[in-house]
Amino acid sequence: MNKKIKLFDPVIDHLEEEKILEVLRSGNWASGAGKGNVKKFEENFQKYTNSDDCIAVNSGTAALNLALSLLNIKNKHVILPSMSFVSTANAVVMNGGIPVFVEIEPETMCIDPESVKKLLTKKTSVILPVHFGGMPCKLDKLNQIIKGFKCTIIEDAAHAAGTSYKKKKIGSHSFASCFSFHPVKNLAMPTGGAITINNKQHTKIRKELESKRWCGITDRKLSEYNVKDIGNNYYMNEFSAAIGLIQLKKLDRMNKQRREIAKIYCKEIDLENKMQFDQNCSYHLFWIRVKNRNKFRKILDKKKIETGTHYKAIHTFDFYQKFNKAPMTKKISEEIVTIPIHPNLKSHEIDKIVSVINSTN
């Protein structure tokens, strides 16, 4: 019986298994202080991204919430794409900001700088671009557009571990970049996230984030501590960090494999609307667009090929309908299909995916 071709599949071997056993037997499974494997992961990821600093947290959502908490965005506008996981917008609202949805570039699914220019005002506090599917946004253009505005770029890099832009890793460009680590992500963990910081005051910012990720705890000496501001239980556990350390060593190799698959898809899938090839992209996702999506997905499901719909446009959810619309994004979100792209795919599975899509189209 043929197995289903998975949409996502983490790449693990004996190294992750051995590391998990090591943590399990140590008895040191988690620490709000962020020592042990968590500290090592922060140091290694900071070096990998060539950022000024790195703070590990327990999800990409936590990373976004904490990064935005560094700025006073209450009642201020945050410009972001509607094409993203809902956490991107949730983090804005949870910090008191007002989400302003802009259109995306159909060829990249990333935020459209020209749309940003049209909606940028004195009320705008943050631009929140999403490196969709691992495709780098046009950060240079965004930085040019916000000149003269009191505006900060915080990157949603949930898809972009290992992505580069202008020969520099994502995580090294802006004030803050927010990463997500999960079994479906390029750098897999049970759950995890990170914030990279680039700022002259990064040491001070780090201390603030360390406190906020541990319920506001600060000035800790033995069992004594203080709380000067509220925080959340956002710290990363030792198991996630241990797996992350192994995954980070493999990341560039795994991303190279993803790019090789993407190159095949770009060349052989006979569809006009599909993800483009970019040597800088980490290809967390590979998307295509089809007219009759439900019918298309059912055919692929019968052929035992998993697909996804990343994502439903955020502004169409009930809660977000009170904010502005992005009609082109809505149309695209109703046509988008994500197909398997991960290093565990075999050559015959890649061939099957291409063949079934071409015969179904």
PLM-predicted stretches and their roles:
Residues M1-A30:
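N-terminal "arm"/small-domain region of PLP-dependent enzymes with the aminotransferase-like
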Residues S31-H77, M83, A91-N95, F101-E103, ...:
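Phosphate-binding glycine-rich loop
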Residues L70-G148, T152-A157, S164:
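PLP-dependent aminotransferase-like
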Residues A160-K166, H173-L285, H315-D318:
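Active-site region of PLP-dependent enzymes
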Residues L120, N143-T152, M189, A194-C215, ...:
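Basic phosphate/pyrophosphate-binding loop/patch that engages nucleotide-derived ligands
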Residues R213-S223, I264, K295-P327, K331-V337:
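Conserved PLP cofactor-binding pocket of PLP-dependent enzymes
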